[in-house]
C-alpha cells in the first residue's frame, strides 16, 4: 500500500494505491473516487456488535467501508467530511489514542476500540471520548483545520487545550485539568487543558 496526501492542509485528500488483493478500511462517506478494479464492501466493527456500539459512542460509525483491489492494482481517494488536514501514523504493534470523530481510514488489521477502563472516565471530564487504534499498519486521522505534530523526549511536557488535541501515542502520559478556578476560566477563555509528558508524539 502506497499513500499520498494531496491538497494540504485545508482540503487534504488521501490517495491510496493498492496492490492486487490489498485492502484499506475507511469511514462511510470518505470515498471521493476509486478505480474500476476496486470493490467496496461494508462491514461492522471487527470485534462484533459490542465494539460496534462502543465505536458509535466514540463518535465513529458502527460500520466501515472496505476497499479491495481485485485482480489488478487500484487507487482509492478519500477525504474528511469537512475542510481540514489528514495525518498518517504507522503503528508497529502499538496504540494510538484519538478523539471522537478523528478516525478516517486504516489498514484492515487495525483494531478500533473505545472501551479501555479509567481512561475513558478521565477524558470524559475533558469533553473527549477516547478511541484506541491498536495493532500494526497504517492509520489516518483527520481534523478540522491544520494538524501539527509535537514530539516529546523522555520527561518533556506540553500543555494543550482540550479542544485542540486530536491524537497521542499510547506511551505518552497525560491528564486533564481545569485552568484555575471559575474566575480564571471565564476571564481567560480557557476551560480544560491536557498535560502531556513524553516520550512520544501527540
Each predicted region: which residue ranges?
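Phosphate/adenylate-binding glycine loop and adjacent helical scaffold
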Residues: 1-202
Amino acid at each position: 500500500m502506497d499513500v499520498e496526501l494531496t491538497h494540504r492542509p485545508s482540503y487534504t485528500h488521501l490517495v491510496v494505491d493498492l496492490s492486487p488483493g490489498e485492502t484499506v478500511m475507511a469511514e462511510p462517506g470518505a470515498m471521493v473516487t476509486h478505480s474500476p478494479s476496486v470493490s467496496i464492501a461494508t462491514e461492522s466493527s471487527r470485534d462484533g456488535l459490542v465494539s460496534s456500539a462502543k465505536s458509535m459512542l466514540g463518535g465513529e460509525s458502527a460500520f466501515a467501508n472496505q476497499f479491495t483491489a481485485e485482480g489488478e492494482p487500484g487507487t482509492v481517494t478519500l477525504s474528511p467530511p469537512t475542510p481540514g488536514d489528514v495525518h498518517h501514523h504507522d503503528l508497529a504493534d502499538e496504540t494510538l489514542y484519538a478523539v471522537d470523530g478523528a478516525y478516517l481510514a486504516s489498514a484492515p488489521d487495525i483494531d478500533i476500540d473505545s472501551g479501555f477502563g479509567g481512561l475513558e472516565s478521565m477524558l470524559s471530564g475533558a469533553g473527549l471520548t477516547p478511541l484506541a487504534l491498536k495493532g500494526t499498519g497504517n492509520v489516518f486521522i483527520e481534523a478540522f483545520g491544520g494538524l501539527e505534530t509535537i514530539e516529546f523526549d523522555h520527561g518533556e511536557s506540553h500543555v494543550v487545550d482540550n479542544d485542540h488535541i486530536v491524537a497521542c501515542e499510547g506511551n505518552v502520559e497525560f491528564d486533564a485539568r481545569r485552568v484555575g478556578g471559575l474566575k480564571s476560566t471565564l476571564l481567560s477563555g480557557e476551560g480544560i487543558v491536557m498535560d502531556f509528558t513524553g516520550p512520544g508524539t501527540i
